Amino acid sequence: MEDDTPDVSSDSNGDAAYSDYFLDYKSIMDEITITTQPKSGYVIRNKPLRLQCRANHATKIRYKCSSKWIDDSRIEKLIGTDSTSGVGYIDASVDISRIDVDTSGHVDAFQCQCYASGDDDQDVVASDVATVHLAYMRKHFLKSPVAQRVQEGTTLQLPCQAPESDPKAELTWYKDGVVVQPDANVIRASDGSLIMSAARLSDSGNYTCEATNVANSRKTDPVEVQIYVDGGWSEWSPWIGTCHVDCPLLRQHAHRIRDPHDVLPHQRRTRTCNNPAPLNDGEYCKGEEEMTRSCKVPCKLDGGWSSWSDWSACSSSCHRYRTRACTVPPPMNGGQPCFGDDLMTQECPAQLCTADSSRIVISDTAVYGSVASIFIVASFILAILAMFCCKRGNSKKSKPLKPQKMNSEKAGGIYYSEPPGVRRLLLEHQHGTLLGEKISSCSQYFEPPPLPHSTTLRSGKSAFSGYSSTRNAGSRAALIQECSSSSSGSGGKRTMLRTSSSNCSDDDNYATLYDYMEDKSVLGLDTSQNIVAAQIDSNGARLSLSKSGARLIVPELAVEGEKMLYLAVSDTLTDQPHLKPIESALSPVIVIGQCDVSMSAHDNILRRPVVVSFRHCASTFPRDNWQFTLYADEGSGWQKAVTIGEENLNTNMFVQFEQPGKKNDGFGWCHVMTYSLARLMLAGHPRRNSLSAAKRVHLAVFGPTEMSAYRRPFELRVYCVPETGAAMESVWKQEDGSRLLCESNDFILNEKGNLCICIEDVIPGFSCDGPEVVEISETQHRFVAQNGLHCSLKFRPKEINGSQFSTRVIVYQKASSTEPMVMEVSNEPELYDATSEEREKGSVCVEFRLPFGVKDELARLLDMPNESHSDWRGLAKKLHYDRYLQFFASFPDCSPTSLLLDLWEASSSGSARAVPDLLQTLRVMGRPDAVMVLERFLSAFPQIVSP
């Protein structure tokens, strides 16, 4: 019988056989798992990145970053039990600082992991890898917006490219501090630019681009976007005015009227510049606002004779004549012409004709022949004397002159010590023969003939000067005119040359004393002008007449070899071009020329443009109502060279005005870039008839120099002259021997309105010996068009011993909103002590703000155009030189950037921050390469001396 009892042993063996097919739930529940992984992130300056790791069933967690274990003391641990599952866990966190990343020494990314384990460290679980980045943002934007002024309806793009950063920065645009919301017209481009497809007036404002990431937030400088609207004319109004005329009455009185057209009826019509009106300094409508036409008058008028003119002078045949014209009135509408002769001749009266004409002619011929004979004999004698003087002078050349110490007052300002690199040319009118006893030369006196218009400066090294390279007495130069053989027989006034040997440069041509000739017909320019000259080579130079308000910059490589160039200033009316009645001169005549007789006056020696700077008297702030015109004479007479705002491809000069508000006396200067030697003058007229333009004038009060002069009747002279510098220099020469008691700058004078000078608060002991209010009518002051406008104020002392004088002079203009100018006048030396001995001192400097190598390196970087306009065009806009950009690109042999830097050199004269400001401009443009060039230069030369 079989036993049905199960075999336990066999069952046990069977369970063992199937044990591998069942899970060990207990071991699975106790397995270490990481539930919170450390996350990648950024370290921000002083803010570390916190890495967090959580593991279940673990007893400890450690961190390993870039193959190095983190010290356990830095790890914050938290042990707990999950309230839901009841599973135990450990939470560990650590702060990764910038120092950890910087000191890791790994070239690759900084990576961290956490490791969870039990007590026996047999089961270790690693987390995911977390990468730690250094968050940063560079300072400078790769592309920055630039100020723009565009017409309404045009497309406008403001570029912006964030600085180099990690993580990538987000860009936000602001307008007047408010975030710009994109719409159908305002588009945000993928490169960060802000595009306005059709600019609207409401889009005008200050725009800023902001770049933001976790590390920082940076903004560009605000740039102004100005949307302007050019004006447009409305329709013409109907003709206004009646054409009725009483013909019988007109015929009755026609003979009394010089021109009947003055009384004939006219019709008038107008239009308005409001379709649309100009906005945001948009261009005003071109053309006339008003139109008139003469009425067609049916009246028939017969011609009538005018009165006979005065008798002419008697001719050589003892006859004289007089004329009349058929103009009172002229015949109209088929009227009869005048009958009779319009010319009458008769013999001169007996007392005016005592001999027959043939005898007079014979007598004149005899006189002329005698004079010619005497002139020939005198010339022969003078030639012999000149040869004798030359031989005598040559025998004394071996004995060099010893420089003598002279009192500056006695020397008349001849000797000046200058720092190295500065060479001064003295051009003062000397009445004495200061050095005449020391110099003996056959070329000390010569007579230049009258010549054509072109004026040059003959240096001591030219022919006919008797210059010797071994001569120690210095060089000589004189203003003369180049002449042809056909004019060599003409006469001219004698020019005296004197030389100086003290405190001069090694190059004799840098220090020369000029005596002015008194006959302007010899020079072509008034000899009262101020002038400075220098021998210039390829290194260039700066010539300056500071008190006359004129400067000349000759850049490097502007001339080949060595050339003597000069800068002169004249405010004489006869030197100015002929202006239209509505135009007014706004500057003196500025002359740049060559002192080389071997060159033709029409040959251009310049290889690149030079920059001429001068002061003007136009008032352009707060309202600029002037339309400026630059007149130039390049050898063929005065012509309009530039009408500001109307430049075209034929414009060969560039004119730049300083912006209002510029420091260092920069406002009121005009800079002209020209490729030729020329005479220049700035003129202007109101933009339209309905506007009134104003000038800036200089007020000055002169009085006696000696205190004893105030013990007897005396007078004060109040001058009102243009604020150009040269005008005041002319006043100084006119007031030679007087004393400046008080002066004031930038008084605004309108063309219309009488000028009044009022005396107040005269000190007790003196009385006004005349009217207390002097009024100069507008027809007399003529908008200070004439030189030296002034009035005299007379005073009388009441006491014999009184000499201390003071009063108050108030200057104002009727019908003007300008504030009256109050001038406190006193003769106390400690209050205001200035005399006419302060004269112009021309100076020459060979130093520039930037060396040629630095400018050449900047030119190589900025000449290459790019799409963002952060090239030379962007630099021109930043410097406000972008009114006529084509000028800078019109010279094939010249870099546009170098031309801009030449103009910047002239504009920044006297500014101590010129180079740092240029550095900041390049930085705002987003040109770190150009910034590096200037920073390297500034680090090598930290102290930039402003020329």
UniProtKB/Swiss-Prot annotation:
GO terms for molecular function: netrin receptor activity; protein tyrosine kinase binding. Interacts (via cytoplasmic domain) with src-1 (via SH2 domain and SH3 domain). Interacts with madd-4. Interacts with unc-129; the interaction is direct. The lineage of its organism: Eukaryota, Metazoa, Ecdysozoa, Nematoda, Chromadorea. Phosphorylated on different cytoplasmic tyrosine residues. May be phosphorylated on tyrosine residues by src-1. Tyrosine phosphorylation is unc-6-dependent. Glycosylated via C-mannosylation by dpy-19 at Trp-305 and Trp-308. Residues 857-938 form the Death domain. Residues 530-658 form the ZU5 domain. Belongs to the unc-5 family. InterPro entries: DEATH-like_dom_sf (IPR011029), Death_dom (IPR000488), Ig-like_dom (IPR007110), Ig-like_dom_sf (IPR036179), Ig-like_fold (IPR013783), Ig_sub (IPR003599), Ig_sub2 (IPR003598), TSP1_rpt (IPR000884). Residues 43-141 form the Ig-like domain. The keyword Membrane applies. Receptor for netrin (unc-6) required for axon guidance. Mediates axon repulsion of neuronal growth cones in the developing nervous system upon ligand binding. Axon migration is mediated by the secreted unc-6, which promotes attraction of neurons and axons through binding to the unc-40 receptor, while repulsion requires both unc-5 and unc-40 receptors. Involved in the ventral-dorsal and anterior-posterior migration of distal tip cells along the body, which may be mediated by Wnt receptor mom-5, ced-10/Rac, ced-12/ELMO and mig-2/RhoG. Pfam families: Death (PF00531), Ig_2 (PF13895), TSP_1 (PF00090), UPA (PF17217), ZU5 (PF00791). SUPFAM superfamilies: DEATH domain (SSF47986), Immunoglobulin (SSF48726), TSP-1 type 1 repeat (SSF82895). The keyword Glycoprotein applies. The chain crosses the membrane at residues 369-389. GO terms for biological process: chemorepulsion of axon; commissural neuron axon guidance; distal tip cell migration; dorsal/ventral axon guidance; establishment or maintenance of actin cytoskeleton polarity; gonad morphogenesis; mesodermal cell migration; motor neuron axon guidance. This is Netrin receptor unc-5. It is found in: Cell membrane; Membrane raft; Cell projection, Neuron projection. Disulfide bonds join 53-112, 160-209, 243-295, 247-299, 273-285. PROSITE patterns: DEATH_DOMAIN, IG_LIKE, TSP1, ZU5. Residues 139-226 form the Ig-like C2-type domain. The modification Phosphotyrosine is found at residue 510.
